[in-house]
Amino acid sequence: MRSIMRFVLAACVFASANSKADSHPVEFWGCNLNEGKSMSDMMAVVGRWNEYMDTLGDSTYDAYLMQPAYGDLLVYDFLWAGSWESLTAMGAETDKFYGNDGGAEMDAAFGEVATCEVHHLWMSTPIRES
């Protein structure tokens, strides 16, 4: 009986640790502002993007706009980082985003303000959470 209890306890601990280590897709865009455009222009487009995202309903997509503070390789005016809870969610939400003209219109609006030369998808595994 003790062996069974130890096994169940170990399985619960393993399952808990395993679920905490799930990977999540995170995209990064490296962008430079177009001639004559500013971060204020970008934030105006971000406001429109947020409104569009709200019309799509529930979403697991979290987005971050990052500007350089210091470093040697500061080649972009800003980075856009966005993450989903899973690859399945990424696919479903990308389909929803481009499922009507709104997604293409948002891409065009971003393109008027900035040129994003780099787009990467990384898998992120939390190693410490607050």
Residue ranges of each PLM-predicted region?
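Hydrophobic h-region of N-terminal signal peptides that target proteins for export
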Residues: 10-18
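Non-heme di-metal
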Residues: 102-107
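Short S/T/G/P-rich N-terminal loop/turn motif that feeds into the first structured element of a domain
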Residues: 17-101, 112-130
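Sec-dependent signal peptide recognition
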Residues: 2-10
